Amino acid sequence: MGQVLPLVTRQGDRIAIVSGLRTPFARQATAFHGIPAVDLGKMVVSELLARSEIPPAAIEQLVFGQVVQMPEAPNIAREIVLGTGMSVHTDAYSVSRACATSFQAVANVAESLMAGTIRAGIAGGADSSSVLPIGVSKKLARVLVDVNKARTLGQRLKLFSRLRLHDLLPVPPAVAEYSTGLRMGDTAEQMAKTYGITREQQDALAHRSHQRAAQAWSEGKLTNEVMTAYVPPYKAPLSEDNNIRGNSTLADYARLRPAFDRKHGTVTAANSTPLTDGAAAVIMMTESRAKELGLTPLGYLRSYAFTAIDVWQDMLLGPAWSTPLALDRAGLTLADLTLIDMHEAFAAQTLANVQLLGSERFARDVLGRAHATGEVDDSKFNVLGGSIAYGHPFAATGARMITQTLHELRRRGGGFGLVTACAAGGLGAAMVLEAE
């Protein structure tokens, strides 16, 4: 086991997560169509503060993330502060770590708390797949810059004459890795082939995810951590996630064709997480500050770890790399955990990471560790479903997972929980949480 790194302040205070909240998650171009991420972020932070009854002035820092950034609001964190009635003196900055963005936001606030520069802060993230920064071609972009410098009408017309019709077409946001040109689904297909993950196994995990998420909603387990959203044109509120298949049957998944490798693939739209809109946030503070304010924390941040691997082959192995580090830093083993919540970007990616956590060979030959991290107990794993069912607004998923896991730990009488995710660029994130 590696070095234990206690997450405490200089006074010995633990890092408390006192409350968390999210919007319902909505499939692309449905309930939140036309609502930018910054508005979703304002919505959730406003409601989170109202429910917590914490004076806004008590929040000294807000760290927020957005993966699909909009040029008109590049610092989403500061816009949220200015748009929610918080003190204008509240420090605010934005972060981005692909699908692990709100993991990073939480880590940053934790570091500020440990350094003693703040005593309370908010961390979270928001993304919209329905409001996207549609760009222009490189040639048109260059001409527009040159036109701005041109002095005469003739010079401007000459510049525009260089353009062809195809140069005027809009350019949607890239869906592939900048460095490799590979889409996330291509990597999921790689992993399915490398680790022998069958189509049947992927479909079964997706079905399980929807079943458990639907059950969590029907049993009222998510009611207190998901707000009701009212958005223009205000025809109907959204109070639950709209991607979950309440009547999921395994036979339905077999009907879909592969989405990436269309001839020989096994990754489909149904066993992958969909493009989604939503926002989530958590309030964090030192343990002593929570006591001063009369607050009972949901739980505590015990440890965290971030990792990075090569992007060309099987790059979505972040959980298999980051989990053992986070456990070492918490002074725990996988067997000590009450719950394990892994981000389901794709069923293939999820199953590959589960497989490698239990692999002695991977631990020895790749991680350089004496023993495997451990076999994942199915009764502890994604017990309320995962991202395949809930959806995945990139920057919001980590905060959703943290809030959801802490609530479930408390329902079970406390214990330790792991939340972990892969991310674009070969990145990985893992956090160990504790509830009493």
Swiss-Prot record:
The keyword Transferase applies. The active site is at C99 (acyl-thioester intermediate), H392 (proton acceptor), C422 (proton acceptor). PROSITE patterns: THIOLASE_1, THIOLASE_2, THIOLASE_3. Its main location: cytoplasm. Gene3D superfamilies: 3.40.47.10. GO terms for biological process: fatty acid beta-oxidation. It comes from Escherichia fergusonii (strain ATCC 35469 / DSM 13698 / CCUG 18766 / IAM 14443 / JCM 21226 / LMG 7866 / NBRC 102419 / NCTC 12128 / CDC 0568-73). It is found in: Cytoplasm. Keywords: Acyltransferase, Cytoplasm, Fatty acid metabolism, Lipid degradation, Lipid metabolism, Transferase. GO terms for cellular component: cytosol. Belongs to the thiolase-like superfamily. Thiolase family. One of its GO terms (molecular function) is acetyl-CoA C-acyltransferase activity. Pathway: Lipid metabolism; fatty acid beta-oxidation. It catalyses: an acyl-CoA + acetyl-CoA = a 3-oxoacyl-CoA + CoA. It holds the Pfam family Thiolase_C. This is 3-ketoacyl-CoA thiolase.
